């Protein structure tokens, strides 16, 4: 079960139980994920669970009847559900809550139904019920249908199956039998009600002597055994899908009638088998049922040969009723098993794999009865032949030819090109899916390998390569599952190797991943220096004013000027301007299932005020079949990491530019040195923070994780392992870079915002000082109109220049300006320190409680000398002191004052 399936089921369960508030779905999801254990079904555990529920139930007979009915329909996951219900019977508190909840829901439903009835004078539900819904309702209520209604039900079933199959095979509709096949009852081979032998010359059997009665009854039985009414034994009309019953002349001798009643079940079973063969021979029921019906028809022919031989004996006067009973014994067992199988298939509405599951289970259950097991093995082997033919095409060639929707793997129409466009497209997961109800029970353990084998070969085929499995052999059903399991495993190993070699060697998957790492994870240092220098001015503009073609040209120039020019895949790198900033994107992704962040998706959009820096991201063009691994989801993760690191690099460049521009301020070394020192110190703290964060992400997160990925890719045995390793690499990078934790992400974004605002403030102040200095320089350096100043003029102008410099310095050190600037710097220092302490405190909590040991490295880097740890301890002590209640001083006799020795004078 995938993570999102667990999210969906937990949310649906909370909704059904009407649980609001509390711990929220996330707590229960986490518990389920940590405590999942596979349920292994055994006969003993299933039986004990069934007995426990039956003992607990008020109507155990109804429960056992329903259980047997579901079991006969081969319902999936029935035993795990029964086991869960048996566990619930032991938990009294949970059971009481569920009973109370069910009672409240029933009352709410009743009140809603009452309100609807009073609101409308004419009920409209009945008028909207279609014929199909009416038939389904009758089936659920177990109402008895007449023969004509049964025929309509069969026609409706065939129509439903035909519509489903034609919808899947839109290009090639399935053939159908002409209508007269179903309209002419004489073609069915079963009893025709009311068409028995002529009764004009029938003598009352009670008037005949005993020997004549026996002879007449034997003749009637020979007719009845082949589906024709006799003179004294006639078939009754069918009531629904019940077994055939017969009416025996009541005047028949009692001893003869008793023996006749023992033989008649053979005729009833023959009628059931004949109807099953004729019904399942229709195209709509699939090849497995066709093969089963054909195998049954072969056995029925042998049965008819036996009846013919008995008729020959009767004509010779050598067949008595006792001999008939003796000769029919072997056939009775065979026909009874065939009828039982036919009834089970009909009741379970089995098609394809579900039919094979039923036959396999029945063969396994007849382990002690060799003849019955041999019969079931014959039927199962015959019925499985078309299924194994589909299976062989799938695991040996990667082709599905399943016109009747019988195979365990279902194909969906998805375009592989959409992997590049649609984030939610799941080509690899949804192009081919497993249908649990169509998995034969003897292939349950290898269903995943069967799915993967065909998928691997199908990918290679779609790339234009012919695939021929060298280990291909015919698969034949046997109770020894190891025979065809080994064949499936050989095909799986071959398909895995073919696709893996194709992607790794011919399509150069690892080289593409290295190219993506070079650009998205900033592995190419000189390229980014060139690129950010070239695009700095353009990226400062709002998104609406940026010319994308200009950015593409600058990207091309930076690629050609750096060592990235040797990258063979550099032309696949593109530029994309995202519609929202990184924080909004990440919070939306993280808010899929959490109630706390759901409100953020409805907040006022900030996309209109985005700058190029906030919207900038790289994109990468990936072609099929590499897009199976480097799909849109993976590229989105790469983009998140890149935008995070790119913005950190931008903040670092801004702080470095502040350091360069601050050299001008060092000329004014009077009073300004006192309050400029605070700004310089804060800038260095910010720069130290940003650089350490970058170093941590690049060299302590991405590089080790990348080396693990490369090692895992070398040892991967199939493409699913490659996909899992790549996804794990990206998930670990996102987690360790603090991009999956909303709380850490918010604090980090606040720190980045403080750094950017500080650099903007310092740049404005430095620019103002530069303008004043430039104006003073022009005032000091201007000469006479006649030419440059002479030596005498320089000596005379020296006092004036010193006076001007003093005036500029005093202007910079003006008390009003100094106090305002100092307050601004103190405010920045206060905000930065508060957010950084908050980040360190949260990192400390997560590194200990969630076992995120990698985050401890960030703490040691940012707080290498314990400076922030002391401040955190001080803040914690102050908070605990404020939160501590004031303890009143108990009143009592005052303690004597301590004596202090006073030294002698």
UniProtKB/Swiss-Prot annotation:
Protein location: Cytoplasm, Cytoskeleton, Microtubule organizing center, Centrosome
Region of interest called Disordered, as start-end residue ranges on this chain: 877-905
GO cellular component term, pick one: ciliary basal body
The keyword Membrane is assigned to this record: no
GO annotation (BP), single: brain development
Modified residues (Phosphotyrosine): 83
Protein name, as recorded: Gamma-tubulin complex component 2
Gene giving rise to this polypeptide: Tubgcp2
